Curated annotation (Swiss-Prot):
Gene Ontology molecular function, alphabetical: chromatin binding; DNA binding; DNA-binding transcription activator activity, RNA polymerase II-specific; DNA-binding transcription factor activity; DNA-binding transcription factor activity, RNA polymerase II-specific; double-stranded DNA binding; protein domain specific binding; RNA polymerase II cis-regulatory region sequence-specific DNA binding
Entry's Gene Ontology cellular component terms: microvillus; nucleus
Organism: Rattus norvegicus (Rat)
Biased composition (Low complexity): 318-328, 344-358
Signal peptide segment: none
Lineage: Eukaryota, Metazoa, Chordata, Craniata, Vertebrata
Protein name: Hepatocyte nuclear factor 3-alpha
Expression sites (tissue/organ): Liver.
Region (Disordered): 269-358
Annotated Gene3D superfamilies: Winged helix-like DNA-binding domain superfamily/Winged helix DNA-binding domain
PTM annotation (Phosphoserine): residues: 303, 327
């Protein structure tokens, strides 16, 4: 056993010369395989004269407090081992061995010295207060809570340098929401640009920095959103800068006062207005622009598709046929119910129209010349025919004039028959169309050729051609 212990000196005189100071006890080489029992204690007593150590005063509380602990101590000086010391020298060594002291840093540890002392009562009295002071510092588990606390505190301190505090965080509102809140809280419901800036900075500390960036965004939001209206200063309010207010129709952008997300975009409603601030009269701007060509139409300046979209309601007033296959029967029906304007259109148009065969398949392939279409279109526009809404290019309501609304049911039945019949098929005689037969009318009137012309222009056929 003694061969495993390597000390600087083998004699007691050498040992005392190395450690002349009685208040210093340095640990040397770890002692392994410390057996429990008094046999090891006797061997250690023979190896080191304990009389000199006890008489030198190492067992006093002062000596314990001044002694240096080796960092290599493991769980040997745990509170359980220290608590086993007052039971006697043999019990103390047994408890230390049971605690797993395989890597004790010193043979002359405080527990070993306390158990090896010649006066057990005095050594235990001195070890009592020392054990209380040793518990928090020598136990390995004592460092865990304090280290965790320090790491947690250090991490929190580092996080504060990288993260803003809660009041200085970026608010979850868009610029449109901020402007709307600022304008709505004003007593006059209007603010200048500088007043909007100031209100945002007063309420949200986040916007007190990088002012140039977000102020540019505020200006862009005011300019490019139709819900904000610019109001000029009145003479009784002199100053610099115009006022900004909310559009009267934009009150429902935010639902229940929640400014986190807009319920609907007011820009879509305001976009048709081509004029300035108010959007009340601007909602009708697009239909009026589409119906703008009220004078004579130049056939060279407009494409056939453009003429077909803009003038179909007025051109087809005298011939309310929904499809190209309705040529002979529709002519008889329209001839019986045509108005005065329709009869006036037949005289110049019939003189310039080419003669076409009476068969239903012959006139479909015949192209329509623009020279005939131009005077027809111009006379219709000069007549001042009413304009209709363009829901569908060949809607029955759009192709019908106001004087022919009483025949609406007849045309509905006729339209249903055309959707399920081929071009050359004969129509049922039960339809209330009336008039002469197909063979009695050889020339086809030009007003009935309009659906045939537009059928080739539109990419999507209206009738079923299978």
């Amino acid at each position: 056993m003694l061969g495993t212990v390597k000390m600087e000196g083998h004699e007691s005189n050498d040992w005392n010369s190395y450690y002349a100071d009685t208040q210093e006890a340095y640990s040397s080489v770890p002692v392994s395989n410390m057996n429990s029992g008094l046999g090891s204690m006797n061997s250690m007593n023979t190896y080191m004269t304990m009389n000199t150590m006890t008489t030198s005063g190492n067992m006093t509380p002062a000596s314990f407090n001044m002694s240096y602990a080796n960092p290599g101590l493991g769980a040997g000086l745990s509170p359980g081992a220290v608590a086993g010391m007052p039971g006697g020298s043999a019990g103390a060594m047994n408890s230390m061995t049971a605690a797993g002291v395989t890597a004790m840093g010193a043979a002359l540890s405080p527990g070993g010295m306390g158990s090896m002392g010649a006066q057990p009562a005095a050594s235990m009295n001195g070890l009592g207060p020392y054990a209380a002071a040793m518990n928090p510092c020598m136990s390995p588990m004592a460092y865990a809570p304090s280290n965790l606390g320090r790491s947690r505190a250090g991490g929190g301190g580092d996080a504060k340098t990288f993260k803003r505090s809660y009041p200085h965080a970026k608010p979850p509102y868009s610029y449109i929401s901020l402007i709307t809140m600022a304008i709505q809280q004003a007593p006059s419901k209007m603010l200048t640009l500088s007043e909007i800036y100031q209100w945002i900075m007063d309420l949200f500390p986040y916007y007190r920095q990088n002012q140039q960036r977000w102020q540019n965004s505020i200006r862009h939001s005011l300019s490019f959103n139709a819900c904000f209206v610019k109001v000029a200063r009145s003479p009784d309010k002199p100053g610099k800068g115009s006022y900004w207010t909310l559009h009267p129709d934009s009150g429902n952008m935010f639902e229940n006062g929640c400014y986190l997300r807009r319920q609907k975009r007011f820009k879509c409603e305001k976009q048709p207005g081509a004029g300035g601030g108010s959007g009340g009269g601007g909602s009708k701007g697009v239909p009026e622009n589409r119906k703008d060509p009220s004078g004579p139409v130049n056939p060279s300046a407009e494409s056939p598709i453009h003429r077909g979209v803009h003038g179909k309601a007025s051109q087809l007033e005298g011939a309310p046929a929904p499809g190209p296959a309705a040529s002979p029967q529709t002519l008889d029906h329209s001839g019986a119910t045509a108005t005065g304007g329709g009869s006036e259109l037949k005289s110049p148009a019939s003189s310039s129209a080419p003669p076409i065969s009476s068969g239903p398949g012959g006139w479909i392939c015949t192209p329509l010349s623009p020279t005939w279409l131009a005077p027809h279109e111009s006379q219709l526009h000069l007549k001042g025919a009413p304009h209709y809404s363009f829901n569908h290019p060949f809607s029955i309501n759009n192709l019908m004039s106001s004087s022919e609304q009483q025949h609406k049911l007849d045309f509905k039945a006729y339209e249903q028959a055309l959707q399920y019949s081929p071009y050359g098929a004969t129509l049922p005689a039960s339809l209330p169309l009336g008039g002469a037969s197909v063979a009695t009318r050889s020339p086809i009137e030009p007003s009935a050729l309009e659906p045939a012309y537009y059928q080739g222009v539109y990419s999507r056929p209206v009738l079923n051609t299978s």
